[in-house]
Amino acid sequence: MEEIQRYLQPDRSQQHNFLYPLIFQEYIYALAHDHGLNRNRSILLENPGYNNKLSFLIVKRLITRMYQQNHFLISTNDSNKNSFLGCNKSLYSQMISEGFAFIVEIPFSLRLISSLSSFEGKKIFKSHNLRSIHSTFPFLEDNFSHLNYVLDILIPYPVHLEILVQTLRYWVKDASSLHLLRFFLHEYWNLNSLITSKKPGYSFSKKNQRFFFFLYNSYVYECESTFVFLRNQSSHLRSTSFGALLERIYFYGKIERLVEVFAKDFQVTLWLFKDPFMHYVRYQGKSILASKGTFLLMNKWKFYLVNFWQCHFYLCFHTGRIHINQLSNHSRDFMGYLSSVRLNPSMVRSQMLENSFLINNAIKKFDTLVPIIPLIGSLAKGNFCTVLGHPISKPVWSDLSDSDIIDRFGRICRNLFHYYSGSSKKKTLYRIKYILRLSCARTLARKHKSTVRTFLKRSGSELLEEFLTSEEQVLSLTFPRASSSLWGVYRSRIWYLDIFCINDLANYQ
């Protein structure tokens, strides 16, 4: 980020958002490669025969070609082979578009720095902790017990490429850059090959995914502007959780305020945050809108959103992409968690003189549970257990050393505990831990051609101490024990900021 600021100094005010000249600079392509945002799939890499090194020679020739008059535009009638570069036209376009993707991200990056500085008093957070998945943590921490209905929205995709260009007009005021963007989209790409909607979310072609993910995220940000306006209008206090680049940075402020309050040894639950009218979050091409309104009100919201997106964004959108579910009757499959609102019954005996009464109270509680059936299915797919959850050995790992086998099983177990540490009930995790531990023992016994009992008796129980690390010891390495009440909060539910995905359990083959 420092490199970007060095090339965009404030004294160049006349060139604010004037990004087109940067595409002729070699350092832009070096920064796009060195920042590692697309390190594993960078099109600026040589062919496999050249040891995957950055080809500055191709970049140099490309920039020289762009400087030449009337040679930048490539006619669609040209052959696929470009004699000057020695590569096909698709690679020629991808090289420019990757550098262009890095350039158009500059205004957003500077805006993010400005937003973070004003929010936390000039404190800049590391970019790897600003992933979109972190929006799910404060979303699950919100009070859902009073909410009634949830709208499941499948985010529409643009039906015309010009919509993507128009979305950036408010951010990039450089007409030349917008014309270049329009040239890429209309000359080199076909919408049917860019976006495929066979799955619930969206997937892009493997060619230069970073460029099109940036365009898609910018487009989705504009769609979400509706919820930002409605949220601010419906709240008594001005919301600070829907600023620039919403759903990214505000978990920090929330956890710091929790620490600040509980460190003072308050023994009561405080409503630290206002009770909003709507709760909104987006994930995997979907979005969820929870509200405490009636079914009639949610149905009006549904048709309002459909009409708004159709008229304002010219989207091919129909009501079947929005489903209304009652929160108390449906469990939400949300980012690997099974979330639901259930009633906790409690019975109180009260006695007045000679008469006694039984009072039944039902309190709503929002639970984030570990889905046991999908997890056992993943373990069965990875040959750790049967479909019924009975542990079995993993023969493909029997050729490894004992330490490698234990390390692999232990890594899977730690990752699962790490990811599902925010669950309100961890009983399921200990069942998964038992399956992995016994599967590890059977794999080791298979390797040494003995039974599990004989192997453990000969090797000792210390061999599997990898699975005996208590949750409290892991948490003590992450959070200081500021007070007893604060430690009680940490023991119940913890959200780790270094999580950005959960990998398939069958990765190790």
UniProtKB/Swiss-Prot annotation:
Disulfide bond annotation, renumbered to this chain: none
InterPro entries for the chain: Domain_X (IPR024937), Maturase_MatK (IPR002866), Maturase_MatK_N (IPR024942)
One family name in Pfam for this protein: Intron_maturas2
Task of the protein: Usually encoded in the trnK tRNA gene intron. Probably assists in splicing its own and other chloroplast group II introns.
Transmembrane domains' residue ranges: none
GO process terms (BP): mRNA processing; RNA splicing; tRNA processing
Localisation: Plastid, Chloroplast
Family statement: Belongs to the intron maturase 2 family. MatK subfamily.
HAMAP family: MatK
Record protein name field: Maturase K
Cellular component, GO annotation: chloroplast
Domain of life: Eukaryota
Main location as per UniProt: plastid
Keyword vocabulary terms for this entry: Chloroplast, mRNA processing, Plastid, RNA-binding, tRNA processing
Gene Ontology MF term list: RNA binding
